[in-house]
Amino acid sequence: MLEREIAAFVERTDTIYPANTATLSAAQQRAIYDRYAAAFTPPLPAGLHVENASFTASLGHSIGLRLYRPVAANPQRAGTVLYFHGGGFVVGSLDSHEIVTARLAADTGLCVIAVDYRLAPEHGVPAAHDDCLEVTLAALAGRLPFASLPAPLLLAGDSAGGNLAASVAMALRDRGTDGTAGLEGVRGIALIYPMLGAEPQLPARETEAHAPLLTLADVYAFRRLYWGNRWDEGHENAAVPAWTLPLHADRFDGLPATLAIGVEHDPLRDDARVFVERIQAAGGEAQAWLGEGLVHGCWRALSTSPGVQQLHATVCRFLLDTLRRPD
């Protein structure tokens, strides 16, 4: 059953974001999504300094970055969050998720950097992953175009961005085994209603296939735009680029502290739970949290929904608690 405030959020969303949006062209989807995001984005919270910059990737393209830095620095809350936005790898921008990134910075006192990675279908797999990995490596090496970013680093993201945070962490772990820069310096990862596998996990894949705001058909449409036709008949053996589907990994050990959040009415709900179970089975530290009565993309209802306010508080508490732990 939907929380009452979430039902109102869904009703308002339906007036802005047509149910068939995932079937439209990427350009049409982005125009609709940008209008939708703007309708739910409040003014910036007080006490933040915002700075835009760009990072030049190894292939020569620019990756947009936006830093939210609390004006009143608190040495007891020193750290930087790299945030990877959601949007099915197809939509989303620095602006679209400001309701999340600005509030995370304001409510934790941490620096938060939003990452404007390349989008599909113009840039298919593994472009988004590669951009986020490059930015993370640059952050760890002190090469981002911002002054005095506090360590340590945390990774976070929602939906597709949750996939990217998990895949970057796995890639860094595996790099560390061959003598290159690894996970040292990354204290934790927070995944909010993430997409972590080629197929959403059961039972939500079946019970929530027609959930509000994200259906199973939507998941498959986004999957095809980013990963291509690898799961179509006749293409089942096409290779999946390493790390881009975290639930397909061979290993779940060696990861930093992990929070994975699922929401009740979402075909992706059980991806978070299964990821946590596999990390725990491998001896790692991970916790799951379930948002009852909530839907995919509900963070935009932060101002009205008690359940979303609890979700947001859970993420903030995890980030701060993780930073307080000894190395």
Name what the model sees in each region:
Residues G88, Y117-P121, L196, V295:
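Alpha/beta-hydrolase active-site loop signature
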Residues L65-R77, L247-F252:
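Short beta-strand-to-loop junctions in surface cap/lid or active-site-entrance loops
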Residues S93-L94, V100, I113-P152, L302-V308:
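Catalytic nucleophile-loop/oxyanion-hole region of alpha/beta-hydrolase
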Residues R77-G86:
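Short beta-strand element of the alpha/beta-hydrolase
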Residues H85-V90, H265:
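Active-site glycine-rich loops that stabilize anionic/oxyanionic intermediates
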Residues G157, G161, A165:
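Gly/Ala-rich beta-loop-alpha elbow adjacent to hydrolase catalytic centers
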Residues M1-L67, D232-E236, L323-D327:
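A glycine/proline-hinged amphipathic helix-loop "lid/cap" segment
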Residues A151, S167-D327:
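Alpha/beta hydrolase fold serine-hydrolase catalytic domain that processes acyl esters and thioesters
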